[in-house]
């Protein structure tokens, strides 16, 4: 999963 700019981890 990739964390977008310190937000919730999205895949």
From Swiss-Prot:
Protein family membership: Belongs to the bradykinin-related peptide family.
Superkingdom of origin organism: Eukaryota
The entry's keywords: Bradykinin receptor impairing toxin, G-protein coupled receptor impairing toxin, Secreted, Toxin
Other remarks in the entry: Is hydrolyzed by angiotensin-converting enzyme (ACE) by only 7.5% (compared to bradykinin).
Naturally occurring in which organism (per UniProt): Cyphononyx dorsalis
Protein name stated in the entry: Fulvonin
Record bears the keyword Kinase: no
GO terms for MF: toxin activity
Subcellular location: Secreted
A single Gene Ontology CC term: extracellular region
Function according to Swiss-Prot or TrEMBL: Inhibits angiotensin-converting enzyme (ACE) with a Ki of 1.2 uM, targets B1 bradykinin receptors (BDKRB1), and potentiates the smooth muscle contraction elicited by bradykinin. In vivo, induces hyperalgesic effects in living rats after intraplantar injection.
Claim: Secreted is one of the keywords in the record: yes
Tissue expression notes: Expressed by the venom gland.
């Amino acid at each position: 999963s990739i964390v977008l700019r310190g937000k919730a981890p999205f895949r």
